[in-house]
Every structure is written in C-alpha cells, then in structure tokens.
Amino acid sequence: MLALNNYLIISAILFSIGTIGVLVRRNAIVIFMCVEMMLNAVNLTFIAFSKYLGNIDGQIFVFFVMTVAAAEAAVGLALMIAFFKNRESIDVEDVNIMKW
C-alpha cells in the first residue's frame, strides 16, 4: 500500500508533464491531451486525499471533474474539427480567427 506522499508525487509529476506539454507543444490535439492529463493529475490528488482522510467527498468531486472533462472533450474536439475544415491545420499558431 502506497503512502499519501507517493500519490502526491505521482500526481505532481503528471501535472508537470501536462503543464510542459501545454506550454511547449503547437498541435492543438496534443495540447488538449495535456490539459486532460492535468485534470487527471488533480483527480488523482482528490482520490489520494479522500482515501487518506477516510471520507468520500474527494471521490464525489472526481465524478464532477470527470463530467466537466467529458463536456470539455466534446466541445473541444468539435471546435478542432470545425477549425480543421476551415483552415486544414490544427496548429495553434494558425489560430488567428479572433483577430480584428
């Protein structure tokens, strides 16, 4: 059985990898996957504290975060598909639709 520190270290590593991926990558799909990795790292932290403290609140909150992540995935992928149909690219450098 792992201690709380081990779960928190794994979660921090996953969150750091996701943050670096968001900051370094140019492909919108890869950035999107890195954001999802960051959300899963937060979920792991909630589960670890929920288990450590012995209450179920963290696990319930994880279900809400997963629901929001699923909605984010649906909307994000729909936006990427629409952008790809218009520009035939999903690089974030090509996103200048919002410019005046």
Curated annotation (Swiss-Prot):
Pfam family, one: Oxidored_q2
Membrane-protein topology: Multi-pass membrane protein
Single annotated GO MF: quinone binding
EC category: translocase
One GO-annotated biological process of the protein: ATP synthesis coupled electron transport
Top-level taxon: Bacteria
Main subcellular localisation: membrane
Record EC number: 7.1.1.-
InterPro entries assigned: NADH_UbQ_OxRdtase_chain4L/K, NUOK/Mnh_C1-like
UniProt-annotated location(s): Cell inner membrane
Gene Ontology cellular component annotations, sorted alphabetically: NADH dehydrogenase complex; plasma membrane
Ranges that cross the membrane: 4-24, 29-49, 60-80
Catalytic reaction annotation: a quinone + NADH + 5 H(+)(in) = a quinol + NAD(+) + 4 H(+)(out)
Keywords attached to this entry: Cell inner membrane, Cell membrane, Membrane, NAD, Quinone, Translocase, Transmembrane, Transmembrane helix, Transport, Ubiquinone
Described purpose of this protein according to its UniProt entry: NDH-1 shuttles electrons from NADH, via FMN and iron-sulfur (Fe-S) centers, to quinones in the respiratory chain. The immediate electron acceptor for the enzyme in this species is believed to be ubiquinone. Couples the redox reaction to proton translocation (for every two electrons transferred, four hydrogen ions are translocated across the cytoplasmic membrane), and thus conserves the redox energy in a proton gradient.
Oligomeric and partner information: NDH-1 is composed of 14 different subunits. Subunits NuoA, H, J, K, L, M, N constitute the membrane sector of the complex.
Stated family: Belongs to the complex I subunit 4L family.
NCBIfam families (alphabetical): PRK05715.1-2 (NF004320), PRK05715.1-3 (NF004321), PRK05715.1-5 (NF004323)
HAMAP family, per the entry: NDH1_NuoK
Designated name of the protein: NADH-quinone oxidoreductase subunit K 1
Gene of this entry: nuoK1
